[in-house]
Amino acid sequence: MSENNTSRKTRTGSVVSDRMEKSVVVRVERKVRHKLYGKFMKTSVKYLADDPENQCNIGDVVLIEECRPLSKRKRWRVKTILEQAV
């Protein structure tokens, strides 16, 4: 009856913290235009993401995708590591 829709939200960001077991904090930055003045400003949001193999390190650029709630604050999962930190 209903098709299985697999399109999920994805975000690209950098890993800020990896001190938790099987979890990382990913900062996603975006540019927002000010309504009145038109200047572009950087805003960022931190997401808690699941990292089951503990592969991510601080400074890695990762692709995260939305998933079912895994804990109180975790709703994202690391899909791929796009760029390793040196």
UniProtKB/Swiss-Prot annotation:
Family matches, as Gene3D superfamilies: Nucleic acid-binding proteins
GO biological process: translation
InterPro entries on file: NA-bd_OB-fold (IPR012340), Ribosomal_uS17 (IPR000266), Ribosomal_uS17_bact/chlr (IPR019984), Ribosomal_uS17_CS (IPR019979)
Keywords: Ribonucleoprotein, Ribosomal protein, RNA-binding, rRNA-binding
Single annotated GO MF: rRNA binding
CC terms in the record's Gene Ontology section: cytosolic small ribosomal subunit
Family as reported in the entry's similarity comment: Belongs to the universal ribosomal protein uS17 family.
Family annotation (PANTHER family): 40S RIBOSOMAL PROTEIN S11 FAMILY MEMBER (PTHR10744), SMALL RIBOSOMAL SUBUNIT PROTEIN US17M (PTHR10744:SF1)
Biological role: One of the primary rRNA binding proteins, it binds specifically to the 5'-end of 16S ribosomal RNA.
Assembly information from the UniProt record: Part of the 30S ribosomal subunit.
Name under which the protein is recorded: Small ribosomal subunit protein uS17
Gene: rpsQ
